[in-house]
Every structure is written in C-alpha cells, then in structure tokens.
A protein has these predicted regions:
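C-terminal motif of bacterial Sec signal peptides marking the signal peptidase cleavage site
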Residues: 14-18
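Periplasmic-binding protein-like
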Residues: 173-181, 248-287, 307-321
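Short loop->beta-strand "edge-of-pocket" segments that line small-molecule binding or catalytic clefts
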Residues: 88-91, 109, 190-206
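Extracytoplasmic small-molecule ligand-binding "clamshell" domains
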Residues: 30-152
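Bacterial signal peptide processing site
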Residues: 20-23
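A ligand-binding cleft/hinge motif common to bilobed small-molecule-binding domains
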Residues: 155-164, 233-266
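Extended ligand-binding regions for polar small-molecule ligands
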Residues: 37, 41-72, 204, 271-309
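Acidic, polar ligand-binding/catalytic clefts
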Residues: 117, 121, 128-192
Length: 321
C-alpha cells in the first residue's frame, strides 16, 4: 500500500513538472521488508503440553554385555539392521559442531554424526555402514514411529512428553539453554528478553521453555536454527534461545553476535529409538558406556566441542531397571 501511494505521488510530481512548474524533483524511496524464512511464524497460543511431569526423563534401560560386531542376537532389532546391511540414523545438517554439511566435501559431520557412526561400528565393525537421513526437529518422533530410521541422533533433548511416544538412550551430552544476541544489544539475561522477539525452532524444548519466562517474550518459531540466525541478522527478531552448544555453532557464522546469560534450563541429549525396540535402546546404552570408558567419547569431544570449554566428561548413565 505504501509503495502504491509513493508511486502515485511520483506520477503526480512528473505531471506537475511537465506543465512547466518549478517544483523540485520528488525523491521516491521504497522500503523493502524482508519476508520471514519459509515456515517461520509468530506464536501467540498457549504453551505446549508438558507431558508426564512425574517421569524420570534421564532414566533409560540398563545394557547387557555388548555382542561382538557381526554377531547380533538372532531375532533382535540389531540383527534386522545387520541383515539390511546398514544403520539408518536421523540427523541434522544445519547445526554446526553436532550435525552439519562440510562445504568442502559435502559430507555430514559433527559430534552427533560420530555418535551415530559408533553405533554402526558396534553392529557391523565398520562405522561407514550407515545411512544418514536428514530430518528436521518436528519430524524426529514421526520417523522413529514409522520405522523410517532406526535411531535419531540430532541434539535430541529427552523430555517426559517425548518419552510418551518414543524411547531414549541414557544421556550422552548435557547442554544448557542460553541466549544469542547482537553484541551491544543490551540483551544478556533471560529477564532482558521481556517483550523482545525471540526465535527458536518449532518442535524443540527451547520453544517450550520460552513460554515459561515471565514476562514472556514474543516467540517466533522457525524450521531451522540457520533460519533463526537469518531472522536475527535481518532485524526480524532480537535474539535466539536454545542450547549453548547450538548457539556456539551459530556464533561461529557471525562475529557480530554472542552467546550470553546464565542457563535457562538443562538440556540432556539422548539417542531416540522406537518405543517397541527396547533391545536396541539397551544396545545403544552399551555402546555409550563403551565409548565413555575407552576414551572415544573424550576424543569426539576434543574433535568437535573443545571450543565450548573444558570437557565435562561423559555423563553418568542412569537406569530404571
């Protein structure tokens, strides 16, 4: 509408000038408003359901002794995977440090990618016997339930709500939800988000935690964290809030932003598994115990996450049986 009015004024000015008037030339300026990335929207509804608050979200199924690679128990979920010839893992391609595509090689890489490869190694003796299936945050439960993937290793925070529909391994990494804002913006605490526009990816626990802030910010959901960063760069939001590990990856892409504030919430990451495949959950927990004890977890941390600070060491597993 504004553009149409400006153009009418411009045409009128030309007409006046054509009649011999001494009216000065009219300067026309059309302001371009960048559209939100595809799938991004402002949320005004109430907070998502929290699920069974009484569950122990970090407790998983205790592993037994790991079978040798290539010798999975007959009739097990792992034997079916071995018969297929590859592990299918749902992963991310837009989260630097955990799961992103190397621009030089085109290969997916990161801490989560290597955790998935260790599961493949334990089944086949070869970490390359794996198919990496890119899934977005909102697809994680559905691809597990449908059997499209065997596991999801995608900065997947364990929650009671999610445990109602899928199963999880023990915790393999614990992150903290923080804030990413422009340097000098004055936004450096959760309280500073009051009334501000904040982006988080739809379907994530980060989004849920923003609803709990009081006063509440204006919450925007996007499809990927890269979209959130684009919205911050274009001035469409004032901050991003999610796990510090994810925010550090975004900050590497833009030197004008910084990770700030104390922890808003703890975010324990687990490997997602179909709820009917308890044997695979126990197997994955055996793999996590093994790589925690033999130094592999620490090697992966040093390779991908060292810039996050001193290693906390592999999380202590907690089991419910």
């Amino acid at each position: 509408m504004r553009t149409r009015i400006l153009l009418v004024l411009f045409v009128f000015a030309l007409a006046v000038a054509g009649c011999g008037s001494t009216v000065a030339p009219v300067s026309v300026s059309v302001s371009a408003v960048e559209p939100l990335p595809a799938g991004a929207t402002e949320f005004t509804a109430t907070a998502p359901a929290a699920g069974n608050a009484d569950c122990d979200r970090e407790a998983s199924w205790r592993p037994g002794p790991l079978p040798p690679p290539g010798a999975m128990p007959p009739g097990s979920t792992m034997a079916a995977i071995a018969e297929r010839g590859r592990l299918i893992a749902g992963v991310d391609q837009n989260t630097d440090l955990f799961g992103s595509r190397n621009p030089a090689t085109g290969q997916l890489e990161g801490f989560d990618i290597d955790i998935a490869r260790e599961i493949a190694r334990a089944i086949f003796g070869d970490p390359d016997r794996i198919q990496l299936r890119v899934v977005n945050a909102k697809e994680r439960e559905s691809v597990l339930q449908s059997g499209e993937v065997d596991v999801v290793v995608r900065t997947y925070s364990i929650t009671c709500e999610r445990k109602d529909v899928v199963d999880f391994s023990a915790v393999y990494y614990e992150a903290n939800q923080k804030i990413l804002s422009a340097k000098g913006s004055g936004i450096d605490t959760a309280a500073g988000l009051a009334g501000k526009r904040v982006c988080a990816v739809s379907g994530t626990t980060s989004l849920s935690k923003l609803y709990e802030l009081n006063p509440r910010p204006k919450i925007y959901g996007a499809t990927t964290w890269t979209d959130c960063l684009l919205m911050l760069q274009q001035g469409q939001v004032d901050a991003i809030s999610t796990d510090d590990a994810v925010l550090k990856g975004l900050a590497k892409q833009d030197p004008t932003v910084d990770v700030v504030g104390d922890s808003i919430a703890k975010e324990p990451y687990g490997v997602g598994v179909n709820k009917d495949h308890q044997d695979l959950v126990r197997f994955v927990n055996g793999v996590l115990e093994k790589i925690g004890q033999d130094g592999t977890w620490q090697r992966l941390y040093d390779s991908w996450l060292e810039e996050l600070g001193p290693s906390p060491g592999p999380p202590e597993p907690r089991y419910k049986d």
